[in-house]
Structures are given as C-alpha cells and as structure tokens.
Amino acid sequence: MDVRSFHWWRTVFFLIPVIGVYTMVLGTLSIASSLIDRSGHFAHRCARAWSWLILATTGVRVDVRGLERLERGRTYIFVANHQSIYDIPVIFASLPYQLRIIAKESLGRFPFLGWHLRRTGHLLVDRRNPDRAGILRRWRALVGEGLSLIIFPEGTRSPDGRVGAFKAGSFLLAIEAGLPVVPISVDGTRFVMRKGHLTTRPGDARLLVHEPIETSGLAPGDARALAERVRAIVAGAVTHDEAGAEDARGSATAPPQRNPGAAARHVDA
C-alpha cells in the first residue's frame, strides 16, 4: 500500500470515526452547558478540549510563538489567514483566551449548530446584507464580557496556502469599536488537510502571534489601509508566500506597538 492510500484509509476508517465520537461527546456537553451558562465559557472549554484531542489524534504538532506579546486580561480581535479546516483547532488549542468566532450566516442553517453558536456568543454575519450597527452592538457586548474575537478576513480557505486579500469590513468594525487587532500567521495546516480534500495527514503546524496594532486614533476611512497592513504582516510569515513577504518588508516602516503585560499563556481561558 502506498503512502497516499494509507492516509486515505487512516482518515476514513480511523480519524473520521474517532473525531466523530469526540464531536458527539463534547458537542453534547457544550450544548447542555449553554442551557444554564449563557456566557459560553464552559462551551469554549469544550471547544479547546475538542481541538486538543483532534490535533493529538491526527498527529499535528503545533509550534506556538509570540504569546508574550499579548497583555493579560485584554480583549483582542485576532486576525488569521485560512489554509485549512485545521486552522480552527490549531487556534483554539493555542490561544489561552475566551474566543468567539465571526462566521458566515450559512452556518446558522445547520440543525442545533446555528442555535448553539448564537447562544454561546459567536457572531454569524450575512455578508450579502451585513447589519453593521447590529454587529457593532454585539461586538461591544462581547468586549464588555471580556471576550476576544477571531476572524478570517480572506472569507474562505486558500487552495495553495497563499494569503489572499483581506476584506476591510471587519477592520472597519474594529476601528469603530476601538479594539486592538492582533495579526496571526498560521502555517503548515494546508499539508495536514487541503481545501477540497478528505485525506488528512499528520504534520507540523506553526502559529505566530504578531505585535498587537492599536486602532485608537484611526478613522473609518483607514480600514482598507489597516486590512492591507495586517495582510502583509500575516503573509510575511507564511512559507512560500513571496508576494506577502515583499509586502511585509514594505510595512516594516510602521512602528511596533508592544503591550508590556504578562505572557498570555497565564490567562485563564
């Protein structure tokens, strides 16, 4: 049996059934907890446990760097590139923060999933008809509860790992809410599971946390420039993204903004 066939059989007859069990058990606990815990904190812990189990079972080792750049107790908007479905467990397992995802409204059509996501604080956005005022109001409510947000501004997974253009809408909301933006570079997950492919392989992934970018003092008209700056930073740390690396070198003139707080690995998530 060749290597490709082995990984296909391993995916279909081992990983999918085992991960299915993890999802049913932890998903049931998460849904049950949301009936009494509207904060979603316990549901988030279930999501982190689910992420750790998936990565361990698949054989994905994650090298996490840059957590010391984050300030303990602060709320952030984490902005990441999107290579693979595995980006989500990598991020949830690596960032010791209470995270909520900004996702497509279409997820809300799945039985139980949409109801559960909304109930535990995740934001589902209709990109065709976004209610900016409503989204901003919900963002501020989450910030008031000490929650951080994770967004994938490319809007879809990259088929080849290259970082696509970042949509400016989320950055406009970040500016209006006055929230710091943290660029996150995720690399290697495309070799674990590529877009449009079922086969999953063990491998190494890397998550790099860049310096937070303060949005105080920025105007709504700066959203596009902020999106391009963050995209350049993220792409510059992704392997083989030469265009992104050139953009990142061009953005190096922007002064770094460091938060001198305690390392985020000590944050209670």
Cite the ranges covered by each PLM segment.
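Non-catalytic C-terminal accessory region of glycerolipid acyltransferases
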Residues: 2, 133-269
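A transmembrane-helix-recognition feature enriched in membrane-embedded lipid enzymes
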Residues: 2-63, 115-119
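Short, flexible loop segments at the rims of nucleotide/cofactor-binding pockets, characterized by
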Residues: 54-57, 78-79, 100, 125-130, ...
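Soluble extramembrane domains of integral membrane proteins
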Residues: 61, 68-72, 83-90
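Generic preference for hydrophobic
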Residues: 64, 78, 101, 122, ...
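Generic beta-sheet signal
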Residues: 74-80, 99, 147-151
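Membrane-embedded segments
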Residues: 83-138
